[in-house]
From Swiss-Prot:
PANTHER family assigned: GLUTAMATE--CYSTEINE LIGASE 2-RELATED (PTHR36510:SF1)
Enzyme Commission number(s): 6.3.2.2
GO MF annotations, alphabetized: ATP binding; glutamate-cysteine ligase activity
Family note: Belongs to the glutamate--cysteine ligase type 2 family. YbdK subfamily.
Superkingdom of this protein's organism: Bacteria
Reaction(s) the record says it catalyses: L-cysteine + L-glutamate + ATP = gamma-L-glutamyl-L-cysteine + ADP + phosphate + H(+)
Enzyme class of the recorded protein, top EC level: ligase
Keyword Isomerase tagged: no
InterPro entries xref list: GCL_type2/YbdK_subfam, GCS2, Gln_synth/guanido_kin_cat_dom, YbdK
Protein name: Putative glutamate--cysteine ligase 2
Gene Ontology BP, a term: modified amino acid biosynthetic process
Assigned keywords, A-Z: ATP-binding, Ligase, Nucleotide-binding
Length: 371
């Protein structure tokens, strides 16, 4: 199978995908209601899509093509409200969060589609353990070489995206000590991690052809990279974020990525090189484990900062691009998160400390999602 052509798209347009938890309203464990939700909303007119995910306890919502923060917030709220109304009809709850706090992976049911059943057969128990919930952001790119440049220059900021969105401190009833434990489930897959260091589309097509020839992959969907090109959309897809607890937070993070992309493609402040990845795994671990208080090493200068400090310096740097895109409110929210060092994982731990109940924490996650 050959790689599909890269469809040039309007630069700095973006789309948001959110994988959602479906819970019962008795003890707030995950419940099997994905197919029922889809049946209820199939005729609803929404500014995007709602699709199944790998298990019946998940569902994915996605916006259409957005250009501004205001549009993203408006569209996400409309889709959320449609889903919440359907969930209320079924007496189930919806919430964000990168992991469910106490679900048991062995109880999950794989959705009956050819691809999901294939993944279940291929990956065994990992497929059910993949009942984790992420935010993906697509960024429009004018041509394929620009997409690869943006992919590799954007990798420098992966710790920012992880720490800002982190909302998965609990797994199977245990505080993991991580801010984003979700990504530990992703790392178990053999084709996860970072994309290969190639900067031209011809080289990428050659790499893809070799991988297809080995029989390891059939399409781009088989790569679980932190950032991957999406040729059919004309985008790169940033995939490291936990699903935030609110659509407003998700929109703010998406617009931070959009604004960074404009800075990187127009100003070209980074000349990507293979050695940039020497600290990549360390930086990613620090963000997952310690969140905004983690250490971030600049791969080109070797300078160490906390991730929150690095975010605040980056916000100053990209301020002119925020003004051009109309994303000032989004970046103000990002700045507030970084200064306060309070992401959703911190909030969840606070709820559990006060209430002494993971069930109550999930209930409050549902309230956050509706707000």
């Amino acid at each position: 199978m050959s790689l599909e052509p890269f469809i040039d798209s309007k630069p700095f347009t973006f789309g948001v995908e959110l994988e959602m938890q479906i819970v019962n309203t008795h003890d707030y464990d995950l419940t099997k209601a994905g197919s029922d939700l889809l049946r209820l909303i199939k005729d609803e007119k929404i500014p995007g899509n709602i699709t199944p995910e790998i298990t019946e306890s998940m569902i994915e919502l996605s916006t259409g093509i957005c250009t501004t923060h205001e549009q993203a917030v408006t569209d996400l709220r409309k889709i959320r409200d449609t889903l919440v109304s359907a969930a209320d009809h079924l007496n189930v709850g919806l919430c964000g969060g990168g992991t469910h706090a106490f679900q048991q992976w062995s109880e999950r049911q794989i959705v009956d589609t050819p691809r999901f059943q294939y993944l279940s057969e291929l990956y065994g128990y990992l497929a059910k353990q993949f009942t984790v919930f992420g935010q993906h952001v697509h960024i429009g790119c004018p041509d394929p070489n620009s997409a690869l440049y943006l992919l590799h220059s954007m990798s420098r900021f992966i710790p920012h995206f992880i720490a800002l969105s982190a909302s998965s401190p609990f797994v199977q009833g245990v505080d993991t000590g991580f801010h984003s434990a979700r990504l530990n489930s992703v790392f178990a897959f053999p084709l996860s991690g970072r994309a290969p260091f190639v900067l031209t589309w011809d080289s990428f097509e050659e790499y893809f052809s070799k991988m297809v020839h080995t029989g390891v992959v059939n399409s781009m969907k088989d790569f679980y990279w932190d950032i991957r090109p999406k040729p059919g959309f004309g985008t790169i897809e940033v995939r490291v974020m936990d699903t935030p607890l609110s659509v407003d937070r998700a929109a703010a993070i998406a617009c931070y990525i959009q604004t960074l992309a404009r800075h990187l493609l127009l100003d070209k402040p980074i000349a990507p090189q293979e050695d940039d990845y020497l600290v990549y795994t360390f930086n990613r671990f620090e963000a997952c484990r310690f969140g905004l208080a983690g250490t971030c090493i600049n791969p080109q200068t070797g300078e160490r900062k906390t991730i929150s400090e690095d975010i605040l310096e980056t916000l100053d740097l990209i301020a002119p691009h925020a003004e051009a895109l109309g994303s000032g409110n989004a970046l103000a929210e990002i700045g507030a998160i970084a200064r306060g060092q309070v992401n959703d994982a911190t909030w969840l731990r606070g709820v559990v400390e006060r209430e002494k109940s993971l069930h109550e924490a999930v209930r409050q996650q549902c309230l956050q999602w509706r707000a």
